[in-house]
């Protein structure tokens, strides 16, 4: 492990076009449940009696807008979450002009909360909301502080700005993410199993020098990586910052 940390530190220190790609494992230490792991959010949602895929779908929003927004308020609004040391480390490298930014599969908005400026949120964010009918925009504080569920303009359901099952990923976001990956000299994957498509397929566009994967479990890209560390991200970053 010590040798891996030394290698990681050397690669990071010698890179000036790092792109980060993050998944659910990065936010677990902030209290955000992993969607798919045992005991994660999907397991909790299943207790509501409907499939997680349906409850997080465009179909459910259209079939039962009231049920959809009540579900979002009950299960998705992570009110007390704060960025952890991994989010802070990524933001610091961007401020130091070593990083092109971060691409994330997460919807918690914690990269932006940590100060990262160049964030491509592939699946949207819970930091923004809008009316499903008239598309009026709302902030997270509008929804949480005022417990606002219906648009004050037209009465429509206020939904989070996330990509639901049955919806397409935002193409401008995909293009920006591809640009970050194609121009990176180092791509650091953190806390992602790299199996959720089409987002995970972006990794195949990396042509730079160093692919680094830090994840508790194996990924389909491990054999292509310069360095693989199967460990907790928070522990790795803490150790890295004390080297």
UniProtKB/Swiss-Prot annotation:
Q: Where does nicotinamide bind?
A: 35, 107-108
Q: Which cofactor does it need?
A: Zn(2+)
Which keywords does this Swiss-Prot/TrEMBL entry list?
A: Cytoplasm, Metal-binding, NAD, Transferase, Zinc
Provide the transmembrane region boundaries: none
Q: Does the keyword Metal-binding apply?
A: yes
Sorted alphabetically, which InterPro entries does this protein's record hold?
DHS-like_NAD/FAD-binding_dom, NAD-dep_sirtuin_deacylases, Sirtuin, Sirtuin_cat_small_dom_sf, Sirtuin_class_U, Ssirtuin_cat_dom
Write the protein's name: NAD-dependent protein deacetylase
Coiled coil ranges (UniProt) are none
Give the active-site positions: 123 (proton acceptor)
Q: Which domain of life is it from?
A: Bacteria
Identify which top EC class this enzyme belongs to: transferase
In short, the EC number is: 2.3.1.286
User: Could you tell me the gene encoding this protein?
Assistant: cobB
């Amino acid at each position: 492990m010590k040798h891996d940390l030394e290698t990681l530190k050397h690669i990071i220190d010698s890179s000036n076009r790092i792109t980060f790609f993050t998944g659910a494992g990065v936010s677990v230490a902030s209290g955000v449940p992993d969607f798919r792991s045992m005991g994660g959010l999907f397991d909790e949602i299943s207790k509501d009696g409907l499939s997680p895929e349906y409850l997080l779908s465009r179909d459910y929003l259209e079939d039962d807008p009231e049920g959809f927004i009540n579900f979002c308020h009950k299960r998705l609004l992570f009110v007390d979450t704060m960025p952890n040391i991994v989010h802070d480390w990524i933001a610091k490298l961007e401020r130091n002009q070593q990083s092109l930014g971060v691409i994330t599969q997460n919807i918690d908005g914690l990269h932006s909360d940590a100060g990262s400026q160049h964030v491509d949120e592939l699946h949207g964010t819970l930091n923004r909301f809008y009316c499903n009918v008239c598309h009026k925009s709302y902030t997270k504080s509008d929804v949480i502080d005022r417990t606002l569920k219906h648009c004050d303009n037209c009465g429509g359901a206020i939904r989070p700005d996330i990509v639901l099952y049955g919806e397409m990923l935002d193409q401008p976001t995909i293009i920006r993410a591809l640009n970050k990956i194609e121009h990176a000299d180092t791509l650091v994957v953190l806390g992602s199993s790299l199996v959720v498509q089409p987002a995970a397929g972006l990794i195949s566009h990396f042509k730079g020098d160093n692919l680094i994967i830090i994840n508790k479990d194996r990924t389909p890209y491990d054999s292509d990586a310069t360095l693989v560390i199967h460990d907790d991200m928070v522990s790795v970053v803490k150790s890295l910052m004390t080297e």
